[in-house]
Amino acid sequence: MPLHVGREGKEDLGYLSDNTGDNISHKNSYYSELTGVYWVWKNFKDSENVGICHYRRFLVNDAGRLFTEAEIESLLSRYDLITTKTLTMRYPYYDGFAHNHNQKDLDVAMEVIGELYPEYMDTLNVMVHKRETWFGNIMICKKTLFDTYCSWLFPIFFEMEKRIDVDAYDDYHKRIYGFISEFLLYVWATVNGLKVYQCKVGMLGEKAETKELKLALSEFFIKKDILGAKQYILEALKKRPDVLMEASDLDGELKLAMQVITT
């Protein structure tokens, strides 16, 4: 079921929108896909199972195809949650977050969790220093479990809003709650001992930001302006460090360009 996430203040695309009913659509610039997650939690009552995907990312079976309804039913009879494969990072999660985002935001998240859910802290303090996470907030599970997760997650962020000011951040770094939630889903599932089925993620095309960056770099290369290309991509990475991630640079062209520029 297509859902226009972040619909508030945007053009009507003819889809079901997340600015109806009980919603936080106006917070999309801070919450990313979580405004859709919130909408499903509060307003969708028509199915025993629910799933969250993106406009270009989908959970797929071992054959690389979308799961059939029968496959999902079979998996959920044996597992609590279907989600992405665990991502192994170059650095511990805490260090990587501090490098790409504002460290104090993660510190505040941990502070709030310690106050609201102190029983999570032993596990959280271990996991935050491991080199593992989940990504994308992509999942399938029973609606009852989904509701339980949302009831745990959103109070954390609503309290964080009272303690941090993200209005001075650029558009990428404002999406702080969307970023942190990817890791918190992993923590929540671990603490609650969920039986998790991890699967591949199918992707349709590259991010618009990745395409734009490649096009700009090609113009520099055509002019043989390597220094200009280096300055451009380094400045772009300050605003969008995600463009070099495998989920963004699908064919590895940007990483190759970085090697050319920096050698």
Residue ranges of each PLM-predicted region?
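ER/Golgi luminal nucleotide-sugar-dependent glycosyltransferases, focusing on the catalytic module
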Residues: 1-263
